[in-house]
Amino acid sequence: MAQPATPRTMAEKVWADHVVAHGTGEGAAREPDLIYIDLHLVHEVTSPQAFDGLRLANRPVRRPDLTIATEDHNVPTVDIDKPIADPVSRTQVETLRRNCAEFGIRLHPMGDAEQGIVHIIGPQLGLTQPGMTVVCGDSHTSTHGAFGALAMGIGTSEVEHVLATQTLPLRPFRTMAVNVDGELPPGVSAKDIILAVIAKIGTGGGQGHVIEYRGSAIESLSMEGRMTICNMSIEAGARAGMVAPDDTTFEFLRGRPHAPTGADWDAAVEAWRQLRTDPGAEFDTEVHLDAAELSPFVTWGTNPGQGVPLSGAVPDPELIVDEGERQAAEKALTYMGLQAGTAMRDVAVDTVFVGSCTNGRIEDLRVVADVLRGRRVADGIRMLVVPGSMRVRAQAESEGLDRIFIDAGAEWRQAGCSMCLGMNPDQLSPGQRCASTSNRNFEGRQGKGGRTHLVSPAVAAATAVRGTLSSPADLSAVPAR
């Protein structure tokens, strides 16, 4: 097949491969393109009205074989064999079960061996593959872009449109390259990279763009790390985030339940290798970071862009030139109960949460276990370790990680979104402060009046041991036995 004369970015290639019909018109008056959707992920919160719309129009689900559902946002992470106590949560879960049964959609319910957070079960089952278009009624669908897929969150009306037609009307996005080159210092993770990126470009810096993460530091990451980075693309305002598929991607997918096999596998890998951005392709925007200059990162405010290195201090709003940003910082410090100039390492927490679609994978749990091994959670600190899926939970238990967590004084939970958001029993009380491996630190995100600091799994574990925001480098060595 002849290559187009104009070099294309990866996002442009995937888009072009999925255009069912081009929109007509020019400029701002141009109609959207109609894009085919390869994989539709569904959960209990954003789908009920979409299914109701199908019923009212007497429409079936167009491709139930390309639609998969799970229960994650509202489910409890303890006593999962008992009825859900909260009536709203219980109704949403029961409604999803009825809808999936009626419309013939595969569902992984609470307690199922493959149940878990929607953005963790897709990749672990091999459903998410390079070059796909993936949608879900959830902001963090961008996670799947780590495989070289064009993945984005959609609203409830769009969920209904995809259920009915397996297509979505979309306008082309702008493209942004975030280049992270060099070698990461010891103790610096994918979570630190993405928090630094968002702090650099702001929560609106990627608005209207698909971000492609590039450079030697990105290429050195595992698939789990790449998923962490793409997961938080939306926190920079981007529509999606992507990483070019490579041998790391292919080895992750090889042998998974829905991955191609035999000759189909060989053909798929050959096609996937062609997705990489062409030499000479131009991005609308480019951003550069030197990996060697990065360090463990934490947030101090109430949006993911309000972050500083752990070695730094709470910023002084008076030094912020932009009036809007200054006012936002003042408001954030009031809500967070922090004083300008306070060293981040002096900020004490009540709770530590490890989990979410950002950092609830087996690699994340191994990092936490390495820090906690032979140590204890500090007095007065509550630590929740919540696997992102039942498969992750089973793997962790087969490796004995659960015993390390429990022996250290942490709570080992069932799979679910848990304390990432205040839609289930795992919530902060007003005024409580949490070091969290999740993706959002908005006011009340983890419970009304709760205060959230976004951190990496390693920082979360060290914080649990010391009781203040810390990295493993701050801990005393474990005595030899």
From Swiss-Prot:
- So which domain of life are we looking at? Bacteria
List the residue ranges of the region (Disordered).
429-451
Disulphide bridges, residue numbers: none
User: What's in the keyword line of the UniProt record?
Assistant: 4Fe-4S, Amino-acid biosynthesis, Branched-chain amino acid biosynthesis, Iron, Iron-sulfur, Leucine biosynthesis, Lyase, Metal-binding
Q: Where is the composition biased (Polar residues)?
A: 429-441
Cofactor info, note text: Binds 1 [4Fe-4S] cluster per subunit.
Q: What class of enzyme is it?
A: lyase
Q: Which cofactor does it need?
A: [4Fe-4S] cluster
Q: Which reaction does it catalyse?
A: (2R,3S)-3-isopropylmalate = (2S)-2-isopropylmalate
Keyword Methyltransferase tagged: no
**By its UniProt entry, which Gene3D superfamilies does this protein fall under?**
Aconitase, domain 3
Which pathway, metabolic or otherwise, does it act in? Amino-acid biosynthesis; L-leucine biosynthesis; L-leucine from 3-methyl-2-oxobutanoate: step 2/4
Q: What are the recorded Gene Ontology BP terms?
A: L-leucine biosynthetic process
So where does [4Fe-4S] cluster get bound? C357, C417, C420
EC number(s) per entry = 4.2.1.33
Q: Name one GO molecular function term.
A: metal ion binding
* Function comment: Catalyzes the isomerization between 2-isopropylmalate and 3-isopropylmalate, via the formation of 2-isopropylmaleate.
Q: How does it assemble?
A: Heterodimer of LeuC and LeuD.
Homology family: Belongs to the aconitase/IPM isomerase family. LeuC type 1 subfamily.
NCBIfam families named in the record: leuC, PRK05478.1, PRK12466.1
What is the protein name given in its UniProt record? 3-isopropylmalate dehydratase large subunit
Q: Organism source for this protein? A: Mycobacterium sp. (strain JLS)
Instruction: Name the gene for this chain.
Output: leuC
